[in-house]
Design a protein with these regions (language model features):
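Membrane-interfacial amphipathic/re-entrant helices at transmembrane-helix boundaries
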Residues: 1-23, 58-70
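Transmembrane helix-bundle core of multi-pass membrane transporters
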Residues: 2, 93, 97-160
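Short, non-helical or kinked segments that cap or interrupt transmembrane helices
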Residues: 6-9, 28-49, 89-102
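Hydrophobic alpha-helical transmembrane segments
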Residues: 12, 20, 41-45, 69-77, ...
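Hydrophobic positions within alpha-helical transmembrane segments of bacterial inner-membrane proteins
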Residues: 20, 24, 28, 41, ...
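Membrane-embedded helix boundary and interhelical linker motif in transport proteins
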Residues: 31-84
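Membrane-helix/interface signature in polytopic inner-membrane proteins
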Residues: 152-175
Length: 175
């Protein structure tokens, strides 16, 4: 009877943010009639790479804020590269998407393990941790990011030519 509190809502929203953001990307993939099993592995690679950028493990970073920006942007670029590789495999060799992404699903977790030497990434960078524990207007920062991603994806799917093409391809690839 005491579970309907703002604290419970806040905790639940915070816990689903990552899943919702990844789910938005998967929605776009599924809307095209495809499937991507490598999402979790790409999250592992990005999660392993991010602290390496802002802690200066890969190369010295003169400013913590530049390091944080690199720690956000470069893992997205790296994950996008792997996604493009999957797309290239599927288109160039006519491999079924489930098979191509299964390969990266398996290899990606290995890449993440090797890049961290199997160690847990532990870091104390308060400026970066603000993304996880910070609040804006009393709402966790992660929730704001999730809401923005959902709104942008909904707008793209409903109001842009690209979004309509994504939905059209999923309905009939030859159309």
């Amino acid at each position: 009877p005491h579970f309907a509190t703002m604290q419970t809502l806040s905790v639940n929203l915070t816990q689903v943010c990552t899943i919702v953001i990844v789910g938005v990307g998967m929605t776009l993939v599924i809307a095209t009639g495809g499937i991507d099993l490598s999402v979790g592995a790409l999250m592992a690679i990005a999660g392993a790479m991010s602290p390496m950028f802002f802690t200066g493990e890969l190369f010295p970073v003169p400013n913590i804020y530049l390091g944080i920006a690199l720690g956000i942007v470069f893992p997205i670029i790296i994950a996008s590269f792997f996604g493009l590789f999957n797309g290239w495999l599927i288109n160039r060799f006519s491999i079924q998407p489930i098979i191509a992404t299964l390969v990266l699903f398996i290899a990606g977790r290995g890449i993440a393990q090797v890049s961290t030497n199997g160690d847990l990434q532990v870091f104390k960078v308060p400026e970066f941790q603000a993304i996880a524990i910070g609040r804006v207007l009393g709402v966790p920062f992660q929730v704001w990011i999730m809401v923005v991603v959902v709104i942008i994806a909904a707008f793209v799917l409903r109001r842009t030519v690209f979004g309509r093409q994504v939905l059209a391809v999923g309905g009939n690839e030859e159309a």
